[in-house]
């Protein structure tokens, strides 16, 4: 498959996924994060099910696993917890642009966890770029809608446009990002030990997590009901059948989520890690700009400078990653 088509899946799927999600939460007083996460897990499970089943016998059964079940279960815990946290942060007054910016600190967290847990060593350029990204993320978060001033350096969070609610939201994003960093390191170890069976990992990470959603069945039911009654209706394109707008965007979000995941995995299998990192970085930048432009999200000049700093640091890290992390 051509590189252009793969890039189209990555940019089209991932950017559209961000836009469809923001369209659902924009101007809404209800939290839809759990129902979005649940439907995404169901969709990916169903789409990946044919790859996981052995059709040579009846009744059909799951194919033999290449990776131990306990490894899948640990990955499920990290992935599920991180996904639920990421999709729930918007009820804490965190906008999509700020969400994207903070998640860029994942490189720094991965580096710290890799050094502390996996005994990895990193080049000076990688460490410097990680510090640059972290500083940029902090600046963009603290001064999201107010400009920097000397008075704002005092510890009164209100002076920089922060509240206890939004600060807790930032904490949730950071925890979710740290869990994803742990998951990345776990997957790296798993692929090195058991082989690069990413399709198996993708299926089990979603399939095994489905029972966990039953712990919040009441919340899922209420969110789905609110999704239907709190939304205007629209006509489905082509067939012209009426449907709740937010429900339509939920379906679109699930479709674009699969396209995004497929494009990223295809890109990972057709190029090197540096190119993948650069492409995903540019994709995040495009998502950020689209969110600000389409939904008129406000970012101060200081926040823009912080954003530029984040992506500058990420670019330097991508360049420095040509020399991979060395074991101690």
From Swiss-Prot:
Membrane spanning stretches: 1-21, 30-50, 66-86, 98-118, 122-142, 166-186, 198-218, 241-261, 274-294, 298-318
Protein's UniProt keywords contain Chloroplast: no
Keywords annotated in UniProt: Golgi apparatus, Membrane, Sugar transport, Transmembrane, Transmembrane helix, Transport
One MF annotation (Gene Ontology) recorded for this entry: UDP-N-acetylglucosamine transmembrane transporter activity
Gene Ontology cellular component list: endoplasmic reticulum membrane; Golgi membrane
Subcellular location: Golgi apparatus membrane
Superkingdom of the source species: Eukaryota
InterPro entries for the chain: SCL35B1-4/HUT1
Membrane topology, as annotated: Multi-pass membrane protein
Purpose of the protein: Sugar transporter that specifically mediates the transport of UDP-N-acetylglucosamine (UDP-GlcNAc) from the cytosol into Golgi vesicles where glycosyltransferases function.
Similarity-based family: Belongs to the nucleotide-sugar transporter family. SLC35A subfamily.
Protein's name according to its UniProt entry: UDP-N-acetylglucosamine transporter YEA4
Organism per entry: Kluyveromyces lactis (strain ATCC 8585 / CBS 2359 / DSM 70799 / NBRC 1267 / NRRL Y-1140 / WM37) (Yeast)
Organism placement in taxonomy: Eukaryota, Fungi, Dikarya, Ascomycota, Saccharomycotina
